[in-house]
Amino acid sequence: MKRDALSALGLASHVAARLADRSRARQVREALEAGQLDVHYQPKIELRSQRVSGVEALVRWRHPTRGLLAPAAFLPTDEHDGPMVELTAHVLDVAIGQAAEWRRRGVSLSVAVNISAASVADERLAGTIDALLRRFDVPARQLVLEITETAVLRDPEGCAELLHEIAGAGVSISLDDFGTGQSSLSRLLRLPIHELKLDREFVRAMSAGHDKDRLVHAILTFAHDLGHRVVAEGVEDRAMLDRLADLGCDEAQGYYICRPLPADELPDWVLRPRGAADRLFSRPLGAGAWEKPFRAPAVAWR
């Protein structure tokens, strides 16, 4: 009897989740059609040079009554649901077009775009990206595609083939939320990955004790041995940033560095002079690596 009740409860929860996802998918489609989805950009810094190395494009919904909403508040939890291919194409269009506009203003930054699981399974993705890069005259090296381990799981071989085609054209591939998925390392090694994004849970856990530091150090060593760069996300304070620099992390992003900005605000943030009050790191570290305050005006390629 108890087992039957638990099974019924589990089924009810699953049905409720599916209905919620369908409702969210419908809302996303309506927001797309109404032109209510904007793209904001969160800067990333290269820890050794302390330069702005690029930005991540993050979708926001200008809800007519609830204000500006982050993705967690409106995207379906199942990335294969509804209009995720259309949403990914929209963000790619906006982000690549914005990169071209910034280039005209003297700010050349790599732009990372999150690619939904549905889009990774879409054989049209490579053609869509190529057409957008040509249309806006943006170099392929300026675009980074962020994929998750979960997106790879449904069709590993097909995903690998598509990503090799895209990477062969010069676009960088980033594995997002590394360490949170269930994909085998052997499978990941077959993908043309250029960087790993260290999940924010690993970054936050560093403050919990030395064992967590050793785990992050092991991930960094593993990635660097394979020739991959590592980006830490979710950096919330100076202690986190200092520790990541000590451990040899390549890049970082988070609210401590800068919140996601509307496109028209980003150039001013990147180009404004920085003084002592803007110093992100608490002390010089290593052999001359941190001799100066963080200098955002010096824009660096990945």
Model-found features: residue ranges?
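EAL-family c-di-GMP phosphodiesterase catalytic domain
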Residues: 1-20, 47-48, 64, 116-121, ...
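Surface-exposed amphipathic alpha-helices with a cationic face
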Residues: 99-103, 133-134, 160-168, 217-224, ...
